[in-house]
């Protein structure tokens, strides 16, 4: 069973509430398969993997914000292409 020192992860992020938000976001990315784990999985659940990545300093709030911005840009491009392709049919 994996042991995660939550206190070390809290120190990396700043406070426990921010840790929860960052860990949940990262766990969802891992669960959806959009990103791969940065640490050995060792049959751990995605929440444990996310906490271990944060504890080791591999994932930070700023990295996730950059990822969100990139995903938003991709989504906007897809929406624009969809809009332009539907306008071609009109």
Curated annotation (Swiss-Prot):
UniProt entry tagged with the keyword Transcription: yes
Listed EC numbers: 2.7.7.6
SMART domains listed in its UniProt record: RNA_pol_Rpb6
Keywords: DNA-directed RNA polymerase, Nucleotidyltransferase, Transcription, Transferase
Gene3D superfamilies named among the record's database cross-references: 3.90.940.10
Gene Ontology BP, a term: DNA-templated transcription
InterPro entries per the UniProt record, alphabetical: DNA-dir_RNA_pol_omega, Pol_omega/Rpo6/RPB6, RPB6/omega-like_sf
GO function term, MF aspect, one: DNA-directed RNA polymerase activity
This protein's GO CC annotations: DNA-directed RNA polymerase complex
EC category: transferase
Lineage: superkingdom: Bacteria
Pfam family, one: RNA_pol_Rpb6
Family per similarity comment: Belongs to the RNA polymerase subunit omega family.
Subunit structure: The RNAP catalytic core consists of 2 alpha, 1 beta, 1 beta' and 1 omega subunit. When a sigma factor is associated with the core the holoenzyme is formed, which can initiate transcription.
NCBIfam families: rpoZ
Functional description taken from the UniProt entry: Promotes RNA polymerase assembly. Latches the N- and C-terminal regions of the beta' subunit thereby facilitating its interaction with the beta and alpha subunits.
Protein name listed in UniProt: DNA-directed RNA polymerase subunit omega
Native organism: Hamiltonella defensa subsp. Acyrthosiphon pisum (strain 5AT)
Encoding gene per record: rpoZ
């Amino acid at each position: 069973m994996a042991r995660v020192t939550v206190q070390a992860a809290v120190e990396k992020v700043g406070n426990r509430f921010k840790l929860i938000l960052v860990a949940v976001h990262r766990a969802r990315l891992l669960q959806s398969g959009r990103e791969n784990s940065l640490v050995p999985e060792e049959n751990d659940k995605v929440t444990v993997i996310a906490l271990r990545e944060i504890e080791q300093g591999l994932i930070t709030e700023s990295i996730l914000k950059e990822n969100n911005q990139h995903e938003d840009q991709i989504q906007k491009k897809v929406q624009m292409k969809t809009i332009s392709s539907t306008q071609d049919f009109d």
